[in-house]
Amino acid sequence: MKKNNLKNLWIGLFLFFVNSTLIADNWPNWRGPKANGVAPNGNPPAEFSENKNVQWKINLPGSGSSTPVIWKDEVFILAAEKTGKKAAGSEDETSNERRNNNSQRRQRPEGRSSERGSSANRNGFGGNSFNREEMMKRFDKDGDGELNDAERQAMRDEFRQQFSRNRGSDRRSNERSRRGGRSGSGSSRGGFGGGRKPTEEYRFSLISYDRESGKENWRSIATTAIPHEGHHRDHGYASASPVTDGKNIIVSFGSRGLYCFDMKGKIEWKKDFGDMRTRNSFGEGSSPTLHENTIVLLWDQEDDSYIYAIDKKNGKIKWKRERNEATGWCTPVVTTHKGVTQVLVNGSKAVRSYRLNDGKLLWQCSGQTGNPVPSIVVDKQNAYAMSGFRGAYIAAIKLGGDGDLTGTESVAWTANRGTPYVPSPLLSNDRIWYLAGNNGILSVRDTKSGKSLIEGERLTGISGVYASPVSASGKVYIVGRNGSIIVLKDSAKFEVLASNKLDEKFDCSPAIVGNQLFLRGKEHLYCIANN
């Protein structure tokens, strides 16, 4: 009897070791095998360019800001492509709108000139529209598609000069200019907010590529649909990353449904959760999480918010819990502490822990800012949650707590400076790496004490950052939106190992497997490896 128990123990340990090694040799989900941005067995090159250490580079269909996931010899991506098919009546509605606009122009009162308004619109100021294209041409000096602090200040100065010239000559025109300037950051016209509801159909696909050559293996269409709302100008309709265990690929297209594919691209089941209503039509972006046979899906929105646990085998809901949260874009993280497997989720009102097997709320801890995007990272002791929209906050929360942990000894340490808006943190070698806002300003802290190791270090050549940092073999990779990629030494001191440049705009987080670094750009997918 004892021999059988010992034999079973050794078999269990062997299978655990094999499974752990297998997962470590893949990048199965958004933030890697341990959901912390680290590739345990990775070692891609530190130096590369368009002409150096590019194993392959391929054109991508449609759009998507989701991260590639890699399993064995396959790379999987999601894409949303316009089909060219318009919604019924959309062209007629456009024609009617044009006729109405022409009629209004003809009825303009005599003596009321449109010359000033036209000039203002051409300059990107005033009127009822905000000419973002012209604004970016004039003020986005580094060409990263985003305005940094200096560029925004230059834009504000230009606004003041424009308004000063108009003031006193035509108060009503000036008032329209002020309203028009503010509306540029709203949601109705795209601008800095969300976009209009599209009138064109999209094709939502899962695509498999050969890892060594970049050749397309297969393409599976999940659905075609006209999305019910718009999205942020830098976002898109394929922003949630897939997740795989080597048996199935789980894909969330949000309001277009949750899908379970086999490894050949065949849909085994799909589930509809209705239409999500996001703040300012910013769009959807939370990725599904997979733990054994349970899928965890976050559904934080402006209407009723929920978190779901779904059976991977059949798509049936295991449990569903209401969340007192508005729109959020973080991805749930699953961890086991002292035998209890729990789901950790960031939120503007609280960080929460749910027991995986039944959805029971174990603990919560408030303090985060609004619009939470960064996902939580965990080690054996703490969960590290942060946010950086209209404020800054990071908290190291001890695992194993119970109830409301706000302001208790269960919060190991906090900080309120330099935290990210979009990029998630990197947790590596007892250090947590993160960026300030969406900018190339780096901070690093010791996870045990919260002590600042690197504070507000500006990364030369990088201004805007959406991608989350990753690390492998003692190297940290930080990808800028303008195609600049800086490689740092994974240490407590700031040391640049290499500065690289690619001819692409990057919003997606990188993936690392073995000696390969995968970078999804606006138009291309790169595989970086030593030649």
Give the positions of each predicted feature.
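Bacterial N-terminal signal peptides that target proteins for export
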Residues: 1-10
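Bacterial N-terminal signal peptides
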Residues: 10-21
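Noncatalytic, solvent-exposed loop/strand surfaces
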Residues: 23-150, 154-531
